[in-house]
Swiss-Prot record:
Cofactor note text: Binds 1 [4Fe-4S] cluster.
Protein source organism: Acinetobacter baylyi (strain ATCC 33305 / BD413 / ADP1)
Transmembrane segments: none
Family matches, as InterPro entries: Dihydropteroate_synth-like_sf, Enolase-like_C_sf, IspG_bac, IspG_bac-typ, NO2/SO3_Rdtase_4Fe4S_sf
Protein family per UniProt: Belongs to the IspG family.
Pathway(s) this gene product operates in, as recorded in its UniProt entry: Isoprenoid biosynthesis; isopentenyl diphosphate biosynthesis via DXP pathway; isopentenyl diphosphate from 1-deoxy-D-xylulose 5-phosphate: step 5/6
Protein name: 4-hydroxy-3-methylbut-2-en-1-yl diphosphate synthase (flavodoxin)
Tree of life domain: Bacteria
PANTHER family associated with the record: 4-HYDROXY-3-METHYLBUT-2-EN-1-YL DIPHOSPHATE SYNTHASE (PTHR30454), 4-HYDROXY-3-METHYLBUT-2-EN-1-YL DIPHOSPHATE SYNTHASE (FERREDOXIN), CHLOROPLASTIC (PTHR30454:SF0)
Gene Ontology molecular functions: 4 iron, 4 sulfur cluster binding; 4-hydroxy-3-methylbut-2-en-1-yl diphosphate synthase activity (ferredoxin); 4-hydroxy-3-methylbut-2-enyl-diphosphate synthase activity (flavodoxin); iron ion binding
UniProtKB keywords: 4Fe-4S, Iron, Iron-sulfur, Isoprene biosynthesis, Metal-binding, Oxidoreductase
């Protein structure tokens, strides 16, 4: 087993509801609703779908006082920590703090006067909630646009440090920071520069990354690269897609880097003429059937005996394709044969049984350690 070479950057630990961000806390996955916030039922349903996908933190846009009231109703109906996304009107921030927001996403620079910022910080302090400073390349201050000519890593850093200085002067330190851009290199440059200046947790993201496929690729490159350098404490994959898809992709990135496990790590061959069954159809069916599982485990499904045994030995459950019967490996050892035309049903049964065994072992360990 190759040792994971990633060493995370030391950061402060803050809290977003029941979820810790930074320090030794696991890298958390976030998403954001795209429903009308005032449509409480639709927003709650979307948050629940993200919760089912494993999301740690959800962000909800609150553009008006009417939306703030709706936010309060949403807060009562979901258990996932909620970040209220607020711009321009500090009164909305004060309202959602009263309604139970777990974090306020603001730019201190567009909330208004120093007095208004002080009121928002006082409300956050009173309610024990955190703040996220969100800097975006598309909304840089005009003087920085003039100074740098275009969005640059240095420009994003300077904007972030301005906002950080405001909170520092108010002796408020329960905050995380993001410096997002839609360009991969600009995003990475900005976060690298920021990570050298502060020890606050960093919220990673490529803003307006694009539609599902291209946005996934851009996010995987930028955020994966930063994570490999130890930069990042929480992340959102911003896609023109369903929020629950953002969650799944976020976990896939973390799983691929060995930083966090959530559900099944599927290992499958791309298939070729050697395959003894239709690998693509089998994997599509398994992914759909097993998407409810959150217990970490490795499942290897290889269509022939060329690479199948080697991959199977490294997985919790491994399948080596053959006809009419395929070979099953359990925990790296040969186990038994199964009918190849019954693969999907057989694999699902084995996975669910393995999940049961893992969870029972965890429960016994908890009982032993607490006795």
């Amino acid at each position: 087993m190759i040792e994971n070479p990633i060493k995370r950057r030391p950061t402060r630990k803050i809290r977003v509801g029941s979820v810790y961000v930074g320090g030794d806390a696991p890298i958390s996955i976030q998403s954001m609703t795209n429903t009308e916030t005032c449509d409480v039922d639709a927003t709650v349903a979307q948050i629940q779908r993200c919760a089912d996908a494993g999301v740690d933190i959800m962000r909800v846009s609150v553009p008006s006082m009417e939306a703030a009231e709706a936010f309060g109703k949403i807060r009562q109906r979901v258990s996932v920590p909620l970040v209220a996304d607020i711009h321009f009107d500090h009164r909305i921030a004060l309202a959602v703090a009263d309604y139970g927001a777990d974090c306020l996403r603001i730019n201190p620079g567009n909330i208004g006067s120093d007095q208004k910022v002080r009121e928002v910080v006082a409300a956050a302090r009173h309610h024990g909630i955190s703040i996220r400073i969100g800097v975006n390349a598309g909304s840089l201050e005009k003087d920085l646009q003039k100074k740098y000519g275009e969005p640059t890593g240095a420009a994003l850093l300077e904007s972030a440090m301005r906002h950080i200085d405001i909170l520092d002067r108010l002796d408020f330190h329960e905050f995380k920071v993001s410096v997002k851009a839609s360009n991969v290199f600009l995003t990475m440059d900005a976060y690298r520069l920021l990570s050298q200046q502060i020890d606050n947790p960093l919220h990673l993201g490529v803003t307006e990354a694009g539609i599902y496929r291209t946005g996934t690729v851009k996010s995987a490159i930028a955020l994966g690269g930063l994570l490999m350098e130890g930069i990042g404490d929480t992340m959102r994959i911003s896609l023109a897609a369903e929020p629950e898809d953002e969650v799944k992709i976020g976990f896939d990135i973390l799983k691929s880097l060995g930083l966090r496990s959530n559900g099944i790590n599927f290992i499958a061959c791309p298939s070729c003429s050697r395959q003894e069954f239709n690998v693509i159809k089998v994997m599509q069916a398994l992914e759909e059937r097993l998407e409810d599982i959150r217990t970490p485990m490795d499942l290897s499904v290889i269509g022939c005996k060329v690479n199948g045994p080697g991959e199977a030995k490294e997985a919790d459950i491994g399948i080596v394709g053959a006809s009419p019967r395929s070979l099953v490996y359990r925990n790296g050892e040969k186990s038994h044969l199964i009918d190849t035309d019954q693969l999907v049903d057989e694999i699902e049964d084995m996975v669910r049984q393995r999940v049961k065994e893992i969870e029972e072992a965890k429960s016994k360990e908890i009982i032993r350690s607490s006795s």
